[in-house]
Amino acid sequence: MSKVSPTETERCIESLLAVFQRYAGREGDNLKLSKKEFRTFMNTELASFTKNQKDPAVVDRMMKRLDINSDGQLDFQEFLNLIGGIAVACHDALLVQPPHP
């Protein structure tokens, strides 16, 4: 029986899981990102965003906004809120671009 290759969407989900797991647990709970782990994630995986910020506290404010249950860490659901927000912002930016001739 042949194995079915994962779809593009399934590969994207696997990638998100792998990235989260790569950063979570370096300081303890491997199911959550600590503030330091989140900062490392942002500076590594979203470096173009963080390097273009004039306010160095922007990452801390993002963490606070994303931390829905106020436990000082981000679980996978809270992490996905960040990813979803970025995806929506990118999609919206594409919608406002003028059409190509």
Swiss-Prot record:
Keyword Repeat found: yes
Gene that this sequence comes from: S100A11
Tissue spec. comment: Smooth muscle and non-muscle tissues.
More info: Binds two calcium ions per molecule with an affinity similar to that of the S100 proteins.
Entry GO MF terms: calcium ion binding; calcium-dependent protein binding; S100 protein binding
Signal peptide: none
Ranges where the EF-hand domain occurs: 13-48, 54-89
One GO-annotated biological process of the protein: regulation of cell population proliferation
Keywords per UniProt: Calcium, Disulfide bond, Metal-binding, Repeat
Listed PANTHER family: PROTEIN S100-A11, S100 CALCIUM-BINDING PROTEIN
Protein name per the record: Protein S100-A11
SUBUNIT field: Homodimer; disulfide-linked.
SUPFAM superfamilies: EF-hand (SSF47473)
A Gene Ontology term for the protein's cellular component: cytoplasm
Organism: Gallus gallus (Chicken)
Matches recorded under CDD domains: S-100A11
Disulfide bonds: none
Binding-site residues for Ca(2+) 1, renumbered to this chain: 30, 32, 37
Binding positions for Ca(2+) 2 per the UniProt entry: 67, 69, 71, 73, 78
